[in-house]
């Protein structure tokens, strides 16, 4: 017979009492009333916050956007095919955030910061909210450093500074993405982190951009955030904010960043789709009333912070697509009013073989001139004026039969200047090479050449300067001024090369 020891039993009971942990877990839950088209209607979730993440029984995550009296409208971050009517949903108590780290450089990710390039997981210990407040007025300083795009037309006449928002706007197939990707390629060796956000693009187009970056060695300082045309509207809407959160992470670590949103028209369309399905009242062009706020809160995050916050910056180049050149549509006018200037790409110029097809007359940079280097200001001052006068004369010359000599000379000069601004894709130019090109054109050295010879001569002149007069490049890069010595070197090089070129052309 087993003897029962009272002391042993009391010890076991005491131990169990000490171990007892009365933990009350309160979970805010609800049930699915209806699901479809990327939207779910939930009954319950009484204490859910606007923008809070909710989790469905089968694992799908959603965002609570509409808080109504009898139900909650949730947008799904996935296809939601396994969600059933009547299944449970619980509030997570969190709002959308993503992991951030240096390890994201060189990777292709989706709007949830998950890698989609098949190269394994990305390690990150820090998190950042997708929606962060933009720096306030006191936290900013005015733009003063240049961000070189490598495109002569932009760097000379529509300069961009670090911390600026410059819109790239134009019809489809006018080279908007090409301008943006060339700008990223030109940041090589400039210590600038680039984020390229593709929203609603064809997967083949995104793959092509990524391949270009890899071939040109740009992927090592670039992050690509991609949500293609077949992605849920919620993820297309979130992608720009994910890109902005990653760029901000580097900006607040005193790094210069450049972010490209390609394009915000598609994000607005995704947001319109979500809003209409949530039965929010439609406004102009069926967009919801807060579509301006959608873009303003995104673009205001690009800034040049004050020196108290470090020497970082975040430059944004949003892209907007127009229909038949109509810049007075709702989304284009909204984004034009938010940004610090716009680069307008014209389908007519593109079809005429002028590429990049930048319409210099209506393109403007409101703050960039403060950031332009002195050397560029010195040589590019009269370029815009001469091109504007040429465009006016060209339109007039179509109706006039006999033109005087001065007008003919001005037309000839304008045609050669326009030829100088042509640049093939993925071939950005350094600042000193741009200065050489503009100076040669505006000072009439090309007037004696045929239009077809201009490009060839300029290429040879750049090579001649690089090999025989390297001190020219040293002067420009060290002083940032087009000094008398630099001008003398350039004039000498032009004369030497012109003699050589004319001899070659004669033989």
From Swiss-Prot:
Membrane topology value: Peripheral membrane protein
UniProt binding sites for ATP: 170-177
Site entry: Required for activity: 363
CDD domains attached to this UniProt entry: ATP-synt_F1_alpha_C, ATP-synt_F1_alpha_N, F1-ATPase_alpha_CD
Record keywords: ATP synthesis, ATP-binding, CF(1), Chloroplast, Hydrogen ion transport, Ion transport, Membrane, Nucleotide-binding, Plastid, Thylakoid, Translocase, Transport
GO MF entries: ADP binding; ATP binding; proton-transporting ATP synthase activity, rotational mechanism
Pfam family, one: ATP-synt_ab_C
Gene Ontology CC, one term: chloroplast thylakoid membrane
Catalytic activity, EC: 7.1.2.2
Source species, domain of life: Eukaryota
Subcellular location field: Plastid, Chloroplast thylakoid membrane
Reactions catalysed, as given in the entry: ATP + H2O + 4 H(+)(in) = ADP + phosphate + 5 H(+)(out)
PANTHER family in alphabetical order: ATP SYNTHASE SUBUNIT ALPHA, MITOCHONDRIAL
HAMAP family recorded: ATP_synth_alpha_bact (MF_01346)
Subunit description: F-type ATPases have 2 components, CF(1) - the catalytic core - and CF(0) - the membrane proton channel. CF(1) has five subunits: alpha(3), beta(3), gamma(1), delta(1), epsilon(1). CF(0) has four main subunits: a, b, b' and c.
Purpose: Produces ATP from ADP in the presence of a proton gradient across the membrane. The alpha chain is a regulatory subunit.
UniProt family annotation: Belongs to the ATPase alpha/beta chains family.
Protein name: ATP synthase subunit alpha, chloroplastic
Lineage, highest ranks first: Eukaryota, Viridiplantae, Streptophyta, Embryophyta, Tracheophyta
């Amino acid at each position: 017979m087993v003897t029962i020891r009272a002391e042993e039993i009391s010890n076991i009971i005491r131990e169990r009492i000490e171990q007892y942990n009365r933990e009350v877990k309160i979970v805010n839950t609800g049930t699915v009333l209806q699901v479809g088209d990327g939207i779910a209607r939930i009954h319950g979730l009484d204490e859910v916050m606007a923008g809070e993440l909710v989790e469905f029984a089968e694992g799908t995550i959603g965002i609570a956007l509409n808080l109504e009296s009898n139900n909650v409208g949730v947008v799904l971050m996935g296809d939601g095919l396994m969600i059933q009517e009547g299944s449970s949903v619980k509030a997570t108590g969190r709002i959308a955030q993503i992991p951030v780290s240096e390890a994201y450089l060189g990777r292709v990710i989706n709007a949830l910061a998950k890698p989609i390039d098949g190269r394994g997981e990305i390690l990150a210990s820090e998190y950042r909210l997708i929606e962060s407040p933009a720096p306030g007025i006191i936290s900013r300083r005015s733009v003063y450093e240049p961000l070189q795009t490598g495109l002569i037309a932009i760097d000379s006449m529509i300069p961009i500074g670090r911390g600026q928002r410059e819109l790239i706007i134009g019809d489809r197939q006018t080279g908007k993405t090409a301008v943006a990707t060339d700008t990223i390629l030109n940041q090589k060796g400039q210590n600038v982190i680039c984020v390229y956000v593709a929203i609603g693009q064809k997967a083949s187009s995104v793959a092509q951009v990524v391949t270009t970056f890899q071939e040109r060695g740009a992927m090592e300082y670039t992050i690509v955030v991609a949500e293609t045309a077949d992605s849920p509207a919620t993820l297309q809407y979130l992608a720009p904010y994910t890109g902005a959160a990653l760029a901000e992470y580097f900006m607040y670590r005193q790094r210069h960043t450049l972010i490209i949103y390609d394009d915000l028209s598609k994000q607005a369309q995704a947001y319109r789709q979500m809003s209409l399905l949530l039965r929010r009242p439609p406004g102009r062009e069926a967009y919801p009333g807060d579509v301006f706020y959608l873009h303003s809160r995104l673009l205001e995050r690009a800034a040049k912070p004050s020196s108290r916050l470090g020497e970082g910056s975040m430059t944004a180049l949003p892209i907007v697509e127009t229909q038949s050149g109509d810049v007075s549509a709702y989304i284009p006018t909204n984004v034009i009013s938010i940004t610090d200037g716009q680069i307008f790409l014209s389908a007519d110029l593109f079809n005429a073989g002028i590429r990049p097809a930048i319409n210099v007359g209506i393109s403007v940079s409101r703050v960039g001139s403060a950031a332009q280097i002195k050397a560029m200001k010195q040589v590019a001052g009269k370029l815009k004026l001469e091109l504007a006068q040429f465009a006016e004369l060209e339109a007039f010359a179509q109706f006039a039969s006999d033109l005087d000599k001065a007008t003919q000379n001005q037309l000839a000069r304008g045609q050669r200047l326009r030829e100088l601004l042509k640049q093939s894709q993925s071939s950005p130019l350094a600042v000193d090479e741009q200065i050489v090109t503009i100076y040669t054109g505006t000072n009439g050295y090309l007037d004696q050449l045929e239009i077809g010879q201009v490009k060839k001569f300029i290429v040879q002149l750049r090579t001649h300067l690089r090999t025989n007069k390297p001190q020219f490049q040293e002067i420009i890069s060290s002083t940032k001024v087009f000094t008398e010595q630099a001008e003398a070197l350039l004039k000498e090089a032009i004369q030497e090369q012109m003699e050589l070129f004319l001899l070659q052309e004669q033989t």
